[in-house]
Design a protein with these regions (language model features):
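Bacterial N-terminal signal peptides
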Residues: 28-38
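Beta-strand initiation motifs
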Residues: 42-43, 80-84, 122-125, 175-179, ...
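Beta-rich, blade/repeat-based domains predominating
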Residues: 48-64, 69, 88-108, 113, ...
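Beta-propeller domains
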Residues: 66-84
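Short, solvent-exposed loop/turn segments at conserved positions within beta-propeller repeat blades
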Residues: 69-70, 109-110, 159-166, 205-206, ...
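A short loop-to-beta-strand structural motif that recurs across blades of beta-propeller domains
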Residues: 73-75, 113-115, 167-169, 209-211, ...
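Short loop/turn segments immediately following beta-strands, especially the blade-tip
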Residues: 213-220, 322
Length: 322
């Protein structure tokens, strides 16, 4: 997620020349789009039309949990209605993940903390710094390391002109050690373990690209490389500007990567070899994240905001079915 409350006056740039596709690239992308499965929007159903800047959808115990960044905390959707499940003032909840079998971690972007909950929503602890004593700045999203530990992004400042301070940190499986494993990322956002289990993909939102890091045996990350640039995956939409980019990213049960393109109202579904498989369009322009239910990739839950510039920051949660 990106956060307009911290940057109301700054977002006035249009797409820069370096992000504008060339004529040859545009033609190639157009052919790719026509050959791909196409835009999948007919199967989109709104399940919460009144969500306040929703994010972080997570299937849990037969229900969908998701956060409201501009709301009280976490909501639960049981298949019929959405209710508030957990509240915390000044949190600015932004991401969710399972931890320690039946616990849940919450990223509090505004509170600069991680909160650990039990299965009933009872707060067990709050963490605001890494093991070296450095405070978190904008905890944003999570990914499993495949061994019980967690990677999470600490985005830094959402300003394209600000110093580049985004980080990725690793939380050990026992919950005792938290260390920085990557830094100088231009607003680190969504992240996911790659299909091979040996790389971590990280959305570098303000650079408009997804990075890949090799994972060492101790969970540390090696030298980064560019996995994909969004401008190489799909044609730009009419209203894109320099702040639009990848938000949440997930490896789907079907082996494809799902990238929430914030500012473009769509999720890009991309194959392992970086080819566009399909796009899923939703009514909210500012798509933040997506998650999967028990049906695997046949059901995708998508969160997004209509207006991130003005309170109460209205948004919606969708269910896309194939």
């Amino acid at each position: 997620m990106w956060h307009a409350r911290a940057l109301m006056e700054s977002r006035c740039a249009t797409i820069s020349e370096k992000r504008r596709p060339s004529a040859r690239r545009t033609a190639r992308l157009l052919i790719t789009a026509l050959l791909a499965a196409g835009t999948a929007s007919a199967g989109v159903q709104t399940i919460d039309p009144h969500a306040l800047y929703p994010e972080g959808p997570l299937w849990d115990q037969g229900r969908l949990l998701y956060v409201e960044y501009a709301g009280p905390g976490i909501k639960s959707w049981d298949g019929k209605e959405a209710t508030v499940w957990w509240r915390k003032a000044h949190c600015g909840a932004n991401g969710l993940i399972h931890f320690r079998t039946d616990h849940i971690l919450v990223a509090c972007y505004d509170g600069n903390t991680l909160v650990e909950l039990d299965r009933r929503g009872k707060e067990l602890r709050s963490i605001d710094k890494d093991s070296s004593g450095q405070p978190f700045v904008g905890p944003n999203d999570f990914a499993s390391d495949g061994h019980g530990g967690i990677y999470f992004s600490a985005s830094g400042v959402y300003d394209i002109k600000a110093p580049i301070t985004g980080k990725v940190l690793h939380l050990s499986a026992d919950g005792r050690d938290i260390r920085v494993v990557a830094d100088t990322i231009h607003y680190s956002n969504g992240l996911t373990l790659a299909k091979d289990g040996r790389h971590l993909l990280v959305a570098e939102m303000l650079a408009g690209r997804v990075l890949s890091f090799p994972i060492a045996a101790d969970g540390s990350l090696g030298v980064r490389s560019v996995w994909a640039r969004l401008q190489d995956l799909a044609l730009p939409t009419p209203n894109e500007d320099a702040y639009d980019g990848p938000d949440g990213i997930k490896l789907g049960p079907d082996g494809n990567y799902y990238i929430a393109q914030n500012g473009s109202g769509r999720v890009l579904v991309v194959s392992e070899d970086r080819k566009l498989v399909r796009t899923i369009s939703v009514p909210t322009r500012y798509v933040t994240n997506m998650g999967f239910g028990p049906d695997g990739a046949d059901t995708v839950y998508i969160t997004g905001a209509f207006d991130p510039w003005k309170a109460p920051y209205p948004g919606a949660v969708y269910r896309w079915t194939r």
